[in-house]
């Protein structure tokens, strides 16, 4: 790392260094996620029990892009794979984020896009989540209100999800 004050050199932040290291090693992962709201404005989250370092956390349905797949197609495919629902339309992209995370036992730079979608069915059920997703680490799923997201002490990704949803809906 460069010393401060040397002309033409910039000290890298920890995130910048990790990002550069992941990119140099070809460990870039593209991903798409869906913020799915029910008629009552609750958001669907899946709980993953990954063990260290990610631990137990809640996140929106989604995952990595397949080769030659675009973000929107990946978002819809992942939603269908994780819920069994293929009748959901995306309303639009609401956020992009970059993060360093462990995936498949290695450090990766993940670039993901988050899409907003709605279902018109209240309390829509996911069938067979235990059998279908145990191998993927999905331990549970539930619909959360924004107030529950604000109050929870559990880990929810992305951080600030309730505010992201409020902003997307113009309720900020």
How would you label these PLM feature ranges?
Residues 42-43:
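Entry beta-strands of beta-propeller and related beta-repeat scaffolds
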Residues 65-89, 97-154:
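Unchanged
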Residues 153-172:
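Charged phosphate-binding loop/patch that engages nucleotide di/tri-phosphates or the phosphate backbone
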């Amino acid at each position: 790392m460069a010393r401060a004050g040397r002309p033409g050199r910039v000290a890298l932040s920890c995130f910048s260094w990790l990002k550069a290291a992941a990119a140099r090693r070809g460990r870039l992962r593209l991903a798409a996620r869906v913020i799915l709201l029910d008629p009552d404005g609750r958001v669907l989250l899946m709980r993953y029990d990954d063990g260290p370092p990610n631990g137990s956390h809640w996140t929106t349905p989604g995952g990595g892009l397949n080769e030659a797949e675009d973000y929107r197609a990946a978002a819809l495919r992942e939603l269908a794979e994780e819920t069994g629902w293929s009748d959901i339309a995306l309303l639009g992209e609401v956020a992009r984020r970059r993060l360093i995370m462990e995936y498949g036992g290695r450090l990766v730079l993940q670039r993901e896009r988050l899409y907003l979608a709605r279902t018109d069915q209240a309390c829509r059920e996911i069938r067979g989540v235990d059998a279908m997703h145990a191998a993927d680490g999905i331990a549970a799923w539930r619909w959360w209100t924004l107030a529950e997201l604000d109050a929870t002490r559990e880990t929810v990704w992305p951080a600030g999800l309730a505010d992201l949803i409020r902003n997307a809906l113009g309720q900020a």
